[in-house]
Amino acid sequence: MNSKSNTQAMETEKIPRLLARLAIPAVVAQIINLLYNIVDRIYIGHIPGVGAAALTGVGLFTPILMLINACAMLAGSGGAPRAAISMGKKDNKTAEKILGNCFVILLLMAVALTVLFFAFAPQLLTLFGASDQTLPYGVDYARIYILGSIFVLIVMGMNPFITTQGFAKISMMTTVIGAVINIILDPIFIFVFNLGVKGAALATVLSQAVGAIWILRFLSGKKTILHLRKENFKLQKEILLPCLALGISTFVMLSTESILSISFTSSLSRYGGDLAVGAMTIITSVSQLATLPLQGICQGGQPIMSYNFGAGNRDRVKKAFFTQFTACTVFTGCFWLIMLLFPKGFAGIFSNNTELITYTAWALRIYMAGIFSLGFQVACQQSFMALGQAKVSLLLACLRKLILLIPLIFILPHFIQNKVFAVFLAEPISDILAAAITTATFFHRFHKILNRK
């Protein structure tokens, strides 16, 4: 589909069909993107003799990984909606300035993060709960991954600009190409070359590098609507700051995910040791099977809402939201049921250690008890972003994790005898409370936002 027909589709195509056309590739891309981490952990968990310790050590790198992702999405999730709104106003020149400024800030963040995390990886992993047994595996994985973080930032930060132009399939191919390469290289580097966790990290970095090249070639080519141009690489405060202001909510969500991961691993290390931390490593991967497809659905809905909001098409904004809302809630409802029925099957994917599988299955049922409500929160919070409501989106991004979940992780063990159970129970309580508050806030403000336009 060419750029003109993409623009016409945003204005005229039936919303359910348009959302499906944009969201399905985005969901597939998110699931495939998840394979970067899941495939690593599956292979690492099955390294003979050291699988459980290696898996736990690599899992302790999660907070750093999430912070790198957060920095990428600061530019991507903030810049892409701003670009879409400008496109809706037929102002592609400003949209291209947004693209160029976001690209440069991604490069600057890559340099800063590489220097910081490479130097302090051992100290940070120890702070997160690494033991003498698991620390070497975490450091080996972290340092190689960190050296390739520039590719991660380009892939995650620039890909939303492809989706927001209506090129969902091109966006999906970014992650498909990288994931396929990662799946092929992982067993070769880990087992054939006997590189262990270093091989897993190297495979991930190389696959992300290919994805970054793919994105840059597309955004510099003829098919894209918005082009990367050198003249737009000069940072402009009036262009960049509104993007970062809008993206800060996603940045906070992912950054608090990092703080949350530290809170979980440090508490579980204290109350349950390496076994509990290993279970949390698996749970983190399984939970992404819910959160990443939700993000994919919202990535499909975001350009529709943003474009039509910019164009003043209120009815299409409403239809896009309610279609997205329904898709998110149906998905999380189904996921909740599957988790309650088959937790052991999911745990067994990541390890052949019977004790770890049994422990993780028990923890999964507790942790996932409120996952059905997550669709409400994500659909509403992401819709605030699509409509340019940065402050409200930021507050709601903080609500679930920073205001509710993290305090509960430390408070509940003081009131419940089984300390590990108390730590896991904090998750469903915060899920349900945050969903109720976010949904009520959105429906209270939605019509007011549309009527102000």
Stretches with model-predicted labels:
Residues 21-40, 144, 178, 207-211, ...:
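Transmembrane helical elements of multi-pass membrane transporters/channels
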Residues 31, 35-55, 125-132, 188-195, ...:
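Helix-terminus/linker motif at the lipid-water interface of multi-pass membrane proteins
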Residues 52-63, 138, 142, 201, ...:
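Small-residue hotspots at the loop-to-helix junctions and early N-terminal turns
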Residues 76, 145-163, 171-179, 200-213, ...:
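Short runs within selected transmembrane alpha-helices of multi-pass transporters and secretion channels
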